[in-house]
Design a protein with these regions (language model features):
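Phosphate-handling DNA/RNA-contact segment within nucleic-acid enzymes
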Residues: 1-102, 117
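Acidic beta-strand-to-loop metal/phosphate-binding motif
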Residues: 61, 100-112, 134-135
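Acidic, metal-coordinating catalytic cores used for nucleic-acid/nucleotide bond scission
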Residues: 66, 87, 107-117, 139-140
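Flexible glycine/proline-rich, aromatic-decorated loop/lid segments
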Residues: 92-97, 122-124, 159, 163
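Long, amphipathic alpha-helical "stalk/connector" segments that mediate intersubunit docking
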Residues: 95, 126-133
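Short, hinge-like loop/turn segments at secondary-structure boundaries
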Residues: 97-99, 121-123, 148-155
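Conserved acidic, small-residue-rich alpha-beta core segments centered on
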Residues: 116-127
Length: 171
């Protein structure tokens, strides 16, 4: 059993679907449509068609659809998600073309999420995009954090998120 979510291109056309498992013990947490001529996971970001119009001068980059949906519901309309754990070079370049001043990496607080944050810093830097890293305590991901502590607490995390060098030095 999965919650199915449409994946849109920049113009708002549905190009694929993503499914998130409802059971925590499911073998694959997320499943996407097969790749096609119009849908390549490495070339797209979930909700970029909405976030590109945000008045915020940054994107919040996270891992999952539910994180993005939760953030948008809480008023963080610049949230986007990779269509896999880590950002790709193509996605980093796409972000760079969107005209935002920086990206706040808000990956899951587990080991793979933190590894993806380090990789993201490097790829975004190569694309000419400044990165900051949001670090959560008390929750595994942005969705859980917002549900437990609220939107104001998440806004404080965004404001206090450290630069890439601070993050790498603090590991």
């Amino acid at each position: 059993k999965r919650v199915m979510t449409p994946i849109f291109d920049l113009r708002g056309n549905i190009i694929a679907f993503g499914g998130r498992a409802l059971a925590s013990d499911a073998p694959a947490k997320y499943l996407n449509s097969s790749e096609t001529y119009v849908f390549q996971k490495r070339d797209n970001l979930f909700a970029l068609n909405y976030a590109k119009n945000s008045k915020a001068d940054y994107f919040i980059l996270c891992e999952g659809y539910m994180d993005v949906i939760s953030m948008h519901q809480a008023g963080f309309d610049s949230a986007v998600a990779t269509l896999g754990t880590a950002i790709t070079a193509t996605q980093a370049r796409l972000i760079g073309r969107m005209g935002k001043s920086e990206v706040i990496l808000s990956y899951d607080s587990d080991g793979p999420g933190q590894k993806a944050a380090s990789r993201g810093i490097n790829l975004l830097s190569e694309a000419g995009v400044k990165a900051r890293v949001l670090q959560m305590t008390g929750a595994k991901d942005p969705d859980e954090y917002i549900k437990k502590f609220g939107a104001q607490a998440f806004a404080h995390l965004i404001e206090s998120s450290g630069g890439a060098i601070d993050y790498e030095m603090g590991k």
